[in-house]
């Protein structure tokens, strides 16, 4: 009996390890399946939201989009394009006005608007992840809240597509600047590892100065390209620094953020506009409910413009 005892111990040991191995495999498989299920559910939510947005603006609100196309001019001439430089956010305004011209075609208006809102939500989600905000649902929740607000803003006939692109642009500037900043810090760490006994760059505070310089430059660039989208960039920088408040140089970054936002007031002489326009152009938007009564008025106006006089008569008689 003593001869076979070690074999029994070895068998028990192998069996316990085999059970533990299967447990790990099943646990990893469950985690992967759970992660895939979450991603699939999030994708379904985005798709349903996009379909609902497209369907509403295409079938219930199309004349608001036609009205914007009729009242928004875009000319492919150098003299006209240079006029965009007279206000902040020239890139967002130029792209938004260009895309608005396609609202004239059927299904194009609702499609462009929905895609731009999805683009803004995607950029917000990526930017929130870059800001070191923990949690799987928080980036998607932030994106969903922003997209919902943009849909509500779009109920207003005066809300321009460029305002949506300004938000998307502000988030994209944060993503790009953060990626460049992280790459620069990694390069500094590699340089210092070559000379571990003499970490000169960190003693000089070079990473901190690079961060503050990056924030200052990014704010001016974001404001020039995307106007009030700079508020999105500033909010993401502020939240990102709060999440890492105990790290060295955080207070310097927050100070640079506040000072640079005040320095934007100097652009008043550059653009010849008031302070409100400097910080809110091309337009923040306001929460309004669907203006269905105004939609009927715009429907009559647009159909008359298109030459559909019989349809105009039917609309007017139907409202009586």
Positions of PLM-derived features:
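Soluble catalytic regions of membrane-associated enzymes that act on cell-envelope
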Residues: 272-320
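Transmembrane-helix motifs of polytopic, lipid-linked glycan transferases
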Residues: 39, 114-132, 148, 171-179
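Start-transfer (signal-anchor) and selected internal transmembrane alpha helices
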Residues: 28-53, 252-258
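Alpha-helical transmembrane segments
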Residues: 42-55, 139-148, 211-217
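Membrane-interface micro-motifs in multi-pass membrane enzymes
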Residues: 67-70, 85, 89, 113, ...
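Membrane-interface coil-to-helix junctions
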Residues: 56-115, 296
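Membrane-interfacial, low-structure loops and terminal tails that flank and connect transmembrane helices
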Residues: 36, 132-133, 185-206, 238-239
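Transmembrane signal-anchor helices characteristic of membrane glycosylation enzymes that use polyprenol
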Residues: 42-65, 222, 260-269
